Amino acid sequence: MEHNKKELNKAVLLAVIRAAHGIRGDVVVNLLGAEPQRLKTYGVLYDDKGRLYEIVSMRVHKNNVIVRFKGVDDRSTAEALKGVQLYIERDQFADDLDTDEFYQIDLIGLRVYDNTNQLLGEVSGFFNFGAGDLLEVRLISHKTELIPFSKAAVPEICVASGFLVVDPVAAGLFSDPHSFNDLALNDLEKG
C-alpha cells in the first residue's frame, strides 16, 4: 500500500530510522520533536516514496525508541530501512494550542515583514543545527537568509493571518535597519 506522494508538501517529518535492533525486525527510531508515547497514536507513517509503515509495537529502552513495523520481521529487512525518514500529515497533530503556540511546519510560507511593515520575503524553512532554532527566509531578492528564531529577532507571529514580523537588526540581517530596502531594490534591479 502506498501514500499519495503528491501530498508530501503537507507532510511533517516525524522520525528517522537509525538502525536495526535485535533479530526480530525491530528498529531504533530517532524522533524529531515528538514525545515517544505519542508516536503510536499517529497510526500509519509513510516515507518519501509513499510506502506505509504501520506500528505493531513500540517501547522505550535506554533513551531509545524501539519500534516494530508490520511486515518487518527480520534483521536484514530492518537493516535495509536505516536512514528512512518517516512522515505524518500535518492535520494529524492536535490543534488545541494556546494563542502563542504553533507547530514549526505552520511557519513555512508565512510572509515576513520588518517592523516598518515592509515585505522582506517568506519563511521557507526551519532548522536547528545545535545552537538554536533558525528560520530560513527567502527574501524578495530571491536570496535566502537564516535568522535566529528568538523573541528579539521575531517579535510577532500571526499564523492565522499568514505573517510574522522580523526586526532586521536583531535578526542580524543588517546593521542599519534602512539598508534592507536599498539592498533588496538593488538585487531586484540586477535581476
From Swiss-Prot:
One of its GO terms (biological process) is rRNA processing. Residues 99-172 form the PRC barrel domain. Its main location: cytoplasm. It is found in: Cytoplasm. GO terms for cellular component: cytoplasm; ribosome. One of its GO terms (molecular function) is ribosome binding. Keywords: Chaperone, Cytoplasm, Ribosome biogenesis, rRNA processing. It comes from the Bacteria. An accessory protein needed during the final step in the assembly of 30S ribosomal subunit, possibly for assembly of the head region. Essential for efficient processing of 16S rRNA. May be needed both before and after RbfA during the maturation of 16S rRNA. It has affinity for free ribosomal 30S subunits but not for 70S ribosomes. Belongs to the RimM family. PANTHER family: RIBOSOME MATURATION FACTOR RIMM (PTHR33692:SF1). The PRC barrel domain binds ribosomal protein uS19. This is Ribosome maturation factor RimM. It comes from Bartonella bacilliformis (strain ATCC 35685 / KC583 / Herrer 020/F12,63). The lineage of its organism: Bacteria, Pseudomonadati, Pseudomonadota, Alphaproteobacteria, Hyphomicrobiales.
